[in-house]
Amino acid sequence: MKDSSFLWYDKPASVWTQALPIGNGTLGGMIYGKVEEETVSLNHDELWTGHPKNTIRPGSLEAFQKARALALDGKLRESQDIIESDFMSTWSQAYLPLGDLVLTFDGSDRKSDYIRSLDLDTAIASVSYRQGKRIMRRELFASHPDKVIAVRLICENGKFDVTASLKCQLHHKVKSQSGLLVMSGEAPSEHNTNGQSDKQSYSKVDSERGMLFTCAVKADTDGKKHISGKGIEITGATVVTLYLTAETSFNGWQNNAFTNGKPHLEPCIERLSKNFDYEAVKSAHIADYRALYSRVELDIGSNGKDNIPTGKRLRNFKKDKNDIALYTLLFNFGRYLAISSSRPGSQPSTLQGIWNEKFCPPWHSNYTVNINTEMNYWPVLPCDMPEVNEPLIEMVRDLSVAGERTAKEMYGMHGFVAHHNVDIWRMTTPVGGCAVWAFWPMSPGWFCEHIFAHYEYTMDEKYLRETAYPIMKKSAEFYCDYLVEDKDGYLIAAPSTSPENNFVLNGSNCAVSQTTTMTMSIIRELFENCIKASDILGEDKEFAEILKDKLKNMLPFRIGKRGQLLEWYNEEKESEIHHRHCSMLYGLHPAHLITADGTPELADACRRSLEIRGDDGTGWSLGWKINFWARLRDGNHALKLFDQQLRFKASTGMNYSHGGGTYENLFDAHPPFQIDGNFGAVSGVCEMLLDCFDGKIYLLPALPDKWSDGSVRGLLAKGNIKVDMTWSGGKLTLYSLTGNGEAHIVYGGKETVHRLDGGTLTVEL
């Protein structure tokens, strides 16, 4: 159905958040669809500022030891002062724009019958319009198999002229070389700000210089062609096909990309020397994309809104929430973004996926790993795309090496550590500024939740043995050292913060506590998963026993006077009661330490915490809350949050606390744009339809009343079991399971055990 798989607009984009994204994990493009002068904003996943360097602050170990002693003594303000004055490091590096492909056409911008679209079923963007007798058509896509962005320009009933040129905000030169338009440049050596200022610098010292890059364009046409540094000029054409590719000199996080970089010009020239057949390139692209995208299909109904432009549908949704297919469209768009921004061999998806137009993007468009990067990958496994997870796993593997030195020199501890920001150079130290965001050594523990889940969904024991468990154990070793006894004999992780949130201490804000609920939840889940992995692999029993002993003595969850789950060590007054982070609820989601059935008292405390926090928030915060309410088995409240996420947002402003929604191109609005909210919504839909924990698969655990009739095909459950479901009148009518082994199915409070033999088992109710 086109109303759930097709974005279309009746005018060109005027701002970036109206443009349509394409990507192949490495190359990204944003298509405006302009008539007289088209712009395709370009990105390459490896193009960042900076170079490898040691960011460990001298004297930080002594500072940490002082801060820990002060926190345990209840001197929290003094502990925070030490952390901020003597422990913090420098800022992460920034993800950069590659440049713009500019297409300048003959004629004016007068047009009729204009349509700009993105087909989620094929991952192809299109533009079409009339100019007098001429019918102008464009197709654009980013091919993963051929590693190019392909642009097809067609004119019916006439001919056209076009000039293709390249622009760039970085230091660069453009020239004609080997029959191609070639742009080569250099990235800044440093982005040393907090992400809100336009400060980037170029060094002349080779060991400090930034990476090099090349972007090249090839043109095939039936018209006349002339190439110079100004561009590729084509006249008298009916068909033009452009193939664009790019490479950087990035050669791994440990190597200097200027002095020890990999080739970047030669691979581009070699790649474009191929005689491409456009239809073959297009067919290979569609087949490659559909191999991932077509694994899942959701149908919750349609109201025949496909004749209304997508932007108008989004605006109308505020008053008319009967456009039920808009939910499915956002679900499908999120899966499209995941495939387009993360592929085997690419870098992981950043705060903005792989799409960034700004020289100094918000928050550096980095990996913010106190929820945002993790949220990017929440829907990947339940939507049966484990391949898309690989870049994240590889980054965590890198961090497990890079963070060893940080753990040893900053904390005096074994294992490895990282904090709340990471970049392509695998920075693991805390950034500068305030402890409220910068002091958070918990990202490895959260990442280990992801890498163990990858095993649970795929059941790949070789992966668990060789990749996941060694990283998990190394992370657990750090937290074993981090734990210390409190005054009551409980093991706590001191000092600690709750990401980006403060409490009131003696009339002013304070972030540092003796420990926090999120910190303890992450450690508890990691230890439990390490014990599970040890049992599965039949090894490391001695270490598992150490973890079991520590779990017995760890500080438990606690409930406050308002019936809420406590966030900090003591019951504190929140500085910002409606704060965007709900970090104390980590045990509810993404972990399963708290469940509606297994720990009802704690689940009620989570519900009360959500009521106190309120429903509104930034875009990604709304996405997280969809997942929370689904875990609490309240599908109607989850859908209420989904409705809020579908609020239309204009392309201006920044808001740290509330006002999240969706831009016209369906990008999530923090605001500004952050892609995590898109992925949080997809994950929330999966949670409403399927939940898996303790060896059981829960079918339709939080189905909203509004989604009374529907079906879903291809969701992946833990145990590597594919699940199809059909429901009517809010009741499950049929389900199919494909996989091996026992499947413990729970529906309507009843558990049924099925034994699967690799085929498909179908059950009618």
What are these regions (language model features)?
Residues 86-110, 675-718, 722:
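Catalytic cores of secreted or luminal carbohydrate-active enzymes
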Residues 461, 465-482, 524, 629-645:
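Extended amphipathic alpha-helical segments enriched in small hydrophobics
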Residues 1-436, 451-455, 473-476, 490-491, ...:
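Aromatic-residue-lined binding/catalytic grooves and analogous aromatic/hydrophobic interfacial grooves
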Residues 348-366, 485-500, 666, 699-711:
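Short, surface-exposed recognition loops and adjoining beta-strand edges that mediate ligand/DNA contacts
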Residues 474-533:
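Acidic/histidine-rich catalytic neighborhood
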Residues 371-381, 441-452, 518-528, 583-592, ...:
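Well-ordered alpha-helical segments within folded domains of soluble proteins
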Residues 353, 357, 493, 501, ...:
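C-terminal catalytic domain of Rieske-type non-heme iron oxygenases
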